[in-house]
C-alpha cells in the first residue's frame, strides 16, 4: 500500500506519515524573492487543494487494500529481501488452559496474530494481559460454540475484520463428568457433544472457504483430540469408555426425547465428553479425505499430554482434583504443564516438520512428536462418513 501511495505523489512534494505537506510558506520567499500576499494566498490555496486530493486518493487505496487479502509475502523490506507476513490463527477456548498457553506460545514468536475466539470477552482480555501477550499480537472475538447462531455470527464478524485465516485451532471443550442429567445447547443438543463436536463442525465447515483463500504457505485446520477417546490406550479403557454405537442418538438429534447420548444409551457426563472427542478425531480424518488433495490444507488432530491441573477438570469431585495431578506426575508420568502443552500445540500450528495431513500427533517422554495410532472406532472410515453426514443435517448444512 505504501508503494502504491508513493506513486501518486509528485517528486517535488513530500508527504510525511502524518499527512502534512512539507511545502512551507513560513519564510514567504522562494530563492530570496518575496511573495506578494496575493501570490502567497494562491499558492497556499493550491497546496491545500493538492493535499485534499492526495488524501482522497490515499484513502481510496487504503479502502481497496483493506478489502483485499494480505499477501503471504511482503515485497517491500529495507534490505530488499522478501519476508513472510505475520500468520493469522483462530484459537477457540483461548481464555484459559491449553488454548491460552498456545496463544501465548505463538504470540511470543512475533510471527503470529492470534484471534482468541471465546465466550467471555472480558475474561479473555484479562487472560491475555495476565499471560503477557502484547496487544498487537492478539484480538478477542466473541464465540459461543453452544449456539450455532453465535458460530455463524463469529464467522461473519471475522470476515468483516478483513483478516486472512491461515490456521484454525478447534480447542474449546466442555467436560461435565459428575453431571447426573444432561444440559443442552441453544439448539437443544446435549451440551458436551453439541459444543465440542457440532459447534466446531459448523465453525470448521464455514471457515474452510477462508482457509482455502489464504496465501500462507502452510494452511492448517487442527482439532484437539484426547487419549480418553482412544480405547487402544490404558486411559481410554477407564470406564465409562467411549462408544458411538450405531449413532442412533446422534441421528435422533441428541435432544433427550429419545436419548441425549450418541449411542442412544443412558446419559453419562464423562462418556459424553469422550464420545465427543471420538467425533473430533473422526471429523479430522473426514476433512482430510474430502479436502486435503483439493485444497492443500493440512488437517490434523493431537493429544498434547495430560494437563492434570487444567481448568477442564473444574467440574470433577474435589478428591479427584487433589489426587489426579500427583498421580499423573509420579505414577503414569504422563503429566505435562499447560505451558509445555501449549508449546506442543503451537508446533502443530507452525512447525514445517508437522505438515503431514490426516495425522494424530502425540509426544513421547522426551517431548518428541510422533504419529500416534487411533483406536479402531476413532479410525473407522465408514463411521466417520456417517458422523459427517448426520452432523451436516443437525447444523443445517444439508
From Swiss-Prot:
Keywords tagged on the record: Chlorophyll biosynthesis, Chloroplast, NADP, Oxidoreductase, Photosynthesis, Plastid, Transit peptide
Its EC number(s): 1.3.1.33
One Pfam family in the UniProt entry: adh_short
Catalytic function, reaction form: chlorophyllide a + NADP(+) = protochlorophyllide a + NADPH + H(+)
Principal subcellular localization: plastid
UniProt keyword Chloroplast present: yes
InterPro entries: NAD(P)-bd_dom_sf, Prochl_reduct, SDR_fam
Group of enzyme by EC: oxidoreductase
Plastid as UniProt keyword: yes
Annotated transit peptide: 1-64
Any one annotated GO CC term: chloroplast
UniProt GO molecular function: protochlorophyllide reductase activity
Location of this chain's protein in the cell: Plastid, Chloroplast
Pathway membership, UniProt: Porphyrin-containing compound metabolism; chlorophyll biosynthesis
GO BP field: chlorophyll biosynthetic process; photosynthesis
NCBIfam families xrefs: LPOR
Family: Belongs to the short-chain dehydrogenases/reductases (SDR) family. POR subfamily.
Function: Phototransformation of protochlorophyllide (Pchlide) to chlorophyllide (Chlide).
Record's protein name: Protochlorophyllide reductase, chloroplastic
Organism: Cucumis sativus (Cucumber)
Amino acid at each position: 500500500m505504501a508503494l502504491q501511495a508513493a506513486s501518486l505523489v509528485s517528486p517535488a512534494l513530500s508527504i510525511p506519515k502524518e499527512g502534512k505537506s512539507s511545502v512551507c510558506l513560513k519564510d514567504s520567499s522562494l530563492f530570496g524573492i518575496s511573495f506578494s500576499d496575493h501570490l502567497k494566498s494562491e499558492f497556499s490555496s493550491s497546496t491545500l487543494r493538492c493535499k485534499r486530493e492526495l488524501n482522497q486518493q490515499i484513502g481510496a487505496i487504503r479502502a481497496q487494500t483493506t478489502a483485499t487479502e494480505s499477501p503471504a509475502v511482503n515485497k517491500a523490506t529495507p534490505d530488499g529481501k522478501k519476508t513472510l507476513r505475520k500468520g493469522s490463527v483462530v484459537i477457540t477456548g483461548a481464555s484459559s488452559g491449553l488454548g491460552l498457553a498456545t496463544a501465548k506460545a505463538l504470540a511470543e514468536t512475533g510471527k503470529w496474530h492470534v484471534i482468541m475466539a471465546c465466550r467471555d470477552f472480558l475474561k479473555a482480555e484479562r487472560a491475555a494481559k495476565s499471560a503477557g501477550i502484547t496487544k498487537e499480537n492478539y484480538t478477542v472475538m466473541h464465540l459461543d460454540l453452544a449456539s450455532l447462531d453465535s458460530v455463524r455470527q463469529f464467522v461473519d464478524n471475522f470476515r468483516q475484520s478483513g483478516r486472512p485465516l491461515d490456521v484454525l485451532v478447534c480447542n474449546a471443550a466442555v467436560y461435565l463428568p459428575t453431571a447426573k442429567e444432561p444440559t443442552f445447547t441453544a439448539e437443544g443438543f446435549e451440551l458436551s457433544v453439541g459444543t465440542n463436536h457440532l459447534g466446531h463442525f459448523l465453525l470448521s465447515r464455514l471457515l474452510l472457504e477462508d482457509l482455502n483463500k489464504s496465501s500462507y504457505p502452510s494452511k492448517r485446520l487442527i482439532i484437539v483430540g484426547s487419549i480418553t477417546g482412544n480405547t487402544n490406550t490404558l486411559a481410554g479403557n477407564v470406564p465409562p469408555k467411549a462408544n458411538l454405537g450405531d449413532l442412533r442418538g446422534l441421528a435422533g438429534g441428541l435432544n433427550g426425547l429419545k436419548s441425549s447420548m450418541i449411542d442412544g444409551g443412558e446419559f453419562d457426563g464423562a462418556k459424553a465428553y469422550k464420545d465427543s472427542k471420538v467425533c473430533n478425531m473422526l471429523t479430522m480424518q473426514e476433512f482430510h479425505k474430502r479436502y486435503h488433495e483439493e485444497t492443500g490444507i493440512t488437517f490434523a488432530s493431537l493429544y498434547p499430554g495430560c494437563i492434570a491441573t487444567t481448568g477442564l477438570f473444574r467440574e470433577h469431585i474435589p478428591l479427584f482434583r487433589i489426587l489426579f495431578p500427583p498421580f499423573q506426575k509420579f505414577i503414569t508420568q504422563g503429566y505435562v504443564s499447560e505451558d509445555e502443552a501449549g508449546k506442543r500445540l503451537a508446533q502443530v500450528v507452525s512447525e514445517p516438520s508437522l505438515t503431514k495431513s490426516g495425522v494424530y500427533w502425540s509426544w513421547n517422554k522426551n517431548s518428541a512428536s510422533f504419529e500416534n495410532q487411533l483406536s479402531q472406532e476413532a479410525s473407522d472410515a465408514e463411521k466417520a462418513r456417517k458422523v459427517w453426514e448426520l452432523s451436516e443435517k443437525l447444523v443445517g448444512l444439508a
